Design a protein with these regions (language model features):
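Glycine-enriched, solvent-exposed interface loops adjoining structured elements
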Residues: 1-239
Length: 239
């Protein structure tokens, strides 16, 4: 089976798997909906493996105005989940430091006027707030802030739209959508259910080790770009 499949190819494969090739009990429009819902499941399964970055949008840059503390999240492609936030050390330098999030209960803890030292020490923090990203304290004007994020899944709206199964993982979409078809028919889905569970185990095992040469480690939450020179998080902004 090809790694990349179109919506039409997925629909044909689902009909074959559910043994409804010549049946219109489930229309193409309904089956397209099932396929998209199953694709959503696969997408979430992959991005839940944070750090493997299967779906990462181009970096999004915010330039602050010195007035507002909240800025709209990216809309093209639409924002889904945040991977990280960086603060530029100057308007001309490509040097950045990592900004840490704050808990809502700590919304006033960092509210003293923002500053940066030569080494980029800062008390700036962020928080996702609805469809905006909220910074505290109000950042100074003309600061560059980069957002690394996962976009929302693009639904399959035409028969020529494709899904990249990466390593045959489109089989998950086919299996799950076929289950939905058979559930509507009130047919036994136990075989497909068992197959789906095996697919989940396989995807979880293989998706996690994308960089087999340098596998991911447990993150050091005590480390901070804000602390100089040790990075231990013990200086201003470290927590």
């Amino acid at each position: 089976m090809a790694t990349t499949l179109t919506r039409l190819e997925l629909r044909d494969a689902v009909r074959q798997r559910a043994d409804i090739v010549n049946s219109q009990f489930i229309t193409d429009a309904e089956l397209n909906s099932y396929i998209n819902q199953s694709y959503f499941e696969l997408y979430d399964l992959l991005i839940s493996k944070y750090g493997d970055n299967y779906y990462v949008a181009p970096v999004y840059t915010i330039t602050t105005d010195g007035i507002n503390d909240q800025y709209a999240l990216p809309s093209s492609p639409a924002f889904y989940k945040l991977l990280g936030v960086d603060l530029g050390l100057s308007n001309t330098s490509d040097s950045f430091v990592t900004i840490r999030p704050f808990e809502f209960i700590d919304r006033n803890r960092y509210a003293v006027p923002n500053f940066q030292s030569f080494y980029g020490l800062t008390n700036l923090r962020y928080r996702i707030n609805g469809d905006k990203i909220w910074f505290t304290p109000i950042p100074a004007a003309n600061q560059r802030i980069r957002l690394w994020y996962i976009p929302r899944m693009t639904t399959l709206s035409a028969d020529g739209d494709t899904v990249d199964g990466i390593s045959g993982w489109t089989e998950y979409i086919i299996c799950d959508a076929a289950m939905k078809c058979m559930q509507k028919e009130e047919s036994d889905v136990s075989v497909l259910m068992a197959e789906k569970q095996m697919l989940i185990k396989r995807i979880e095992a293989m998706a996690e080790s994308r960089d087999v040469g340098s596998p991911a480690r447990v993150s050091d939450n005590m480390y901070s770009d804000f602390s100089f020179p040790s990075g231990s998080g013990g200086n201003f902004g470290g927590g």
